[in-house]
Amino acid sequence: MESNNVVLLDFSGSSFGMRLRIALALKGIKYEAKEENLSDKSPLLLEMNPVHKKIPILIHNGKPICESLNILEYIDEVWHEKCPLLPSDPYQRSQARFWANYIDNKIYSTGRRVWSGKGEDQEEAKKEFIEIFKTLEGELGNKTYFGGDNLGFVDVALVPFTSWFYSYETCANFSIEAECRKLVVWQNCMENERVSKSLPHPHKIYDFVLELKHKLGLA
Amino acid sequence: MESNNVVLLDFSGSSFGMRLRIALALKGIKYEAKEENLSDKSPLLLEMNPVHKKIPILIHNGKPICESLNILEYIDEVWHEKCPLLPSDPYQRSQARFWANYIDNKIYSTGRRVWSGKGEDQEEAKKEFIEIFKTLEGELGNKTYFGGDNLGFVDVALVPFTSWFYSYETCANFSIEAECRKLVVWQNCMENERVSKSLPHPHKIYDFVLELKHKLGLA
């Protein structure tokens, strides 16, 4: 039987790392988590991702895979039997990849402007942020999950950002919940045990955001 | 037998569109190409890609797929038999996706600063541009193609940008060839008939760049 040595180089506040903690938990894969200090990255991190020098990195039997959506596809391909994330139909797969990329291209950068911005730029970012989630609600439609009746690739790509909602809302004084009712229903559905356990408490993220704002001279 | 109605909404100067013209040609898929006017986008384009409103878009039996790497994977999955682009091994697949994403995240934006920039920013962009291709040469190593003995996903993702080399070099007065010898050898290998036919003449791209610079008030 093939041995599976799985190591995840990660940082607990990273939404990108959370995706992989969720996927590994859903699929019941045992792994060793190594928390990185992003201000003083380990030699292992720099060796395993010399191009981007970023977490998360999955090391499977000594070989590194980088970039969270790429790792998510890898995990889904290698351990496909339990809780498949991407559908088997090529068109449905293309749609899932499209929306996961949409999340990657929009939420992190706009979210950063929401928690770190000031004045007009922050107000603009809040509007854009709500628009992004309205667009995602449009894609969700009347389904329970983005994946349909079962959670899938897009759900796992998106749900980590909900652990940041409290920080976005507190830093920028607005309510995502009040604007995006459908998203809240979806979020409640996502709170099955294995997903919740892989997400940090929103207050822990907020502490991290305050620390970061302090470091950046924004607080 | 399943009917295949394939339409490509495209713009001839787009490196992202070229990827798909190459893939469709390599796989021998007949399709209708519809050239878009990017200053006056068609109602079909806006209907088929309401989120990003961008070419290229592949419409397969009436259903749209957007984002060039996503479309490339879709084409490879639906028409897998002839000239497979992604390898079958999950680790090799993850590496191909990693490098294709690297190309997407780096070349277009840095290339734009090379052809449109001025002074110090342009000099900086030229340096970064060469560094990007040096990194890609490192990945190519001693292989004929990024895909190994046969051209693959990364080769198709990258080769369209070579049709822009003349424009980059002429606008910014430098030589990519002089700095990146390995890349030139690779580029020559790529010039098999079906790839060449899918790429516009470098002078046509240069005319387009001059027109664009004029429109943007840079010429």
Curated annotation (Swiss-Prot), chains A, B:
GO terms for biological process: auxin-activated signaling pathway; glutathione metabolic process. Signal peptide: none annotated. May play an important role in hormonal and growth regulatory responses. The keyword Transferase applies. Induction: By auxin and cytokinin. The keyword Transferase applies. Belongs to the GST superfamily. HSP26 family. Its EC number is 2.5.1.18. The lineage of its organism: Eukaryota, Viridiplantae, Streptophyta, Embryophyta, Tracheophyta. Keywords: Auxin signaling pathway, Transferase. Glutathione binds at S14, K41, I55, E67, S68. Coiled coil: none annotated. This is Probable glutathione S-transferase MSR-1. One of its GO terms (cellular component) is cytoplasm. Residues 89-208 form the GST C-terminal domain. It catalyses: RX + glutathione = an S-substituted glutathione + a halide anion + H(+). GO terms for molecular function: glutathione transferase activity. InterPro entries: Glutathione-S-Trfase_C-like (IPR010987), Glutathione-S-Trfase_C_sf (IPR036282), Glutathione_S-Trfase_N (IPR004045), GST_C (IPR004046), GST_C_Tau (IPR045074), Omega/Tau-like (IPR045073), Thioredoxin-like_sf (IPR036249). Gene3D superfamilies: 1.20.1050.10, Glutaredoxin (3.40.30.10). Pfam families: GST_C, GST_N. Residues 4-83 form the GST N-terminal domain.
